[in-house]
Amino acid sequence: MKFFAVLALCIVGAIASPLTADEASLVQSSWKAVSHNEVDILAAVFAAYPDIQAKFPQFAGKDLASIKDTGAFATHATRIVSFLSEVIALSGNASNAAAVEGLLNKLGSDHKARGVSAAQFGEFRTALVSYLSNHVSWGDNVAAAWNKALDNTMAVAVAHL
């Protein structure tokens, strides 16, 4: 999983300040509403932050419109969204905290080896939140749940960069 497993960074919430059951439910239900849009999610991130696209050797330097409809793009987008879905499914249950932490530790370590910066994790977060807020029912409660989840996720993953 490349940089977009970073999406996983955008989702959890198990470590520093665990998500409550209600917060986890908000994150999970909003994610479920868009998780079938793998290609669109990844394309939105690349469109907002071309420096993130440049971290993917198979997509670097290519026009987004020319790669968006390719099998390679769809495969990679699905890989990223599947990882995020796993992390999100585990969130909100204290007995899963170690599993979530392990996934995020590995995410940070893997991305350190690829030269991904904390700033790029922040960019990914911004693009993901923008995508979500435009494609799901987005109120203050949903925004707060996602922000808490992403704060927790970033704290763990970025610590390993």
Swiss-Prot record:
GO molecular function terms noted in the UniProt entry: heme binding; metal ion binding; oxygen binding; oxygen carrier activity
All residue ranges annotated as the Globin domain in the record: 18-161
Key word Ligase present: no
Entry keyword set: Heme, Iron, Metal-binding, Oxygen transport, Signal, Transport
Remaining remarks: There are at least 12 different components in Midge globin. There are at least nine genes for VIIB variants.
UniProt cross-references to InterPro entries, sorted A to Z: Erythrocruorin, Globin, Globin-like_sf, Globin/Proto, Mb-like_M
Signal peptide: 1-16
Assembly behavior: Homodimer.
PROSITE patterns (alphabetical): GLOBIN
Protein's UniProt name: Globin CTT-VIIB-4
Binding site for heme b: 76, 111
Pfam family, one: Globin
Gene name for this UniProt entry: CTT-7B4
Family listed: Belongs to the globin family.
One CC-aspect GO term: hemoglobin complex
Segments forming a coiled coil: none
Transmembrane spans: none
